[in-house]
Amino acid sequence: MISSDVYQIVGNAAYKAHKAINEEAKMQGARPKDYATTLLLAICKKFEFGWFVASFWVGDGALCLYDKNSHTATLLGTPDEGEYAGQTRFLTMPDIFTDSSAFYKRLKCRIVPDFTALFMMTDGVSDPKFETDANLNNPDKWDDLWDDLTHNKEFPVELIDDNEAAKDQLLNWLDFWAPGNHDDRTIAILY
């Protein structure tokens, strides 16, 4: 069983982010919902037995442990969907933290022997690359994303140790064109 300390650390980090947004909104004379944002949070540590990964996910986008060698893609949560298309849940919504059962469902822990990449991305990346939430569970789609990143004809990203140019390569890659997808694009990759 995973220690309650991990839940405290990850859950408190998410809650502190929620509180910080509320405090900033108050200081600016704005409403917290003016700062509506998703949150994709993960911590990980390598041990002799493998990797420990814990996460907290509010909103849409994608948070996934991907392993090309074993052809697996493990979502570390479930994207939130609203009542209508294009709607989601946001970190700024107070009920995210008042319903303890729903809160703990947002926390995930995994131990894996190894992985190729830990991906965290907003829907500006996940929507055009995966098209549906069901496709987020398809390892073939994650293979396609990995191949697009690393073998892109126009803007390849060299995801190798000590590649200082990776950040600029990734920024160039994020500028891809996708009809009907004009949302913000943010991606973090641990590889």
Task: Explain the meaning of each model-derived region.
Residues 100-191:
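C-terminal catalytic subdomain
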Residues 34, 38, 89-90, 124:
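Residue-level preference for alpha-helix termini and adjacent loops
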Residues 46-49, 70, 127:
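Generic "edge-of-domain/loop-turn" microfeature
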Residues 62-64, 81-84, 126-127:
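Short, catalytically relevant binding-site loops at active-site mouths
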Residues 73-119:
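Conserved, helical-rich catalytic subdomain that frames metal- and/or nucleotide-binding sites
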Residues 58, 69-83, 131-147:
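Short, surface-exposed, charged loop/turn segments at secondary-structure junctions
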Residues 1-65, 103-112, 173-175, 179, ...:
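Catalytic core of PPM/PP2C metal-dependent serine/threonine phosphatase domains
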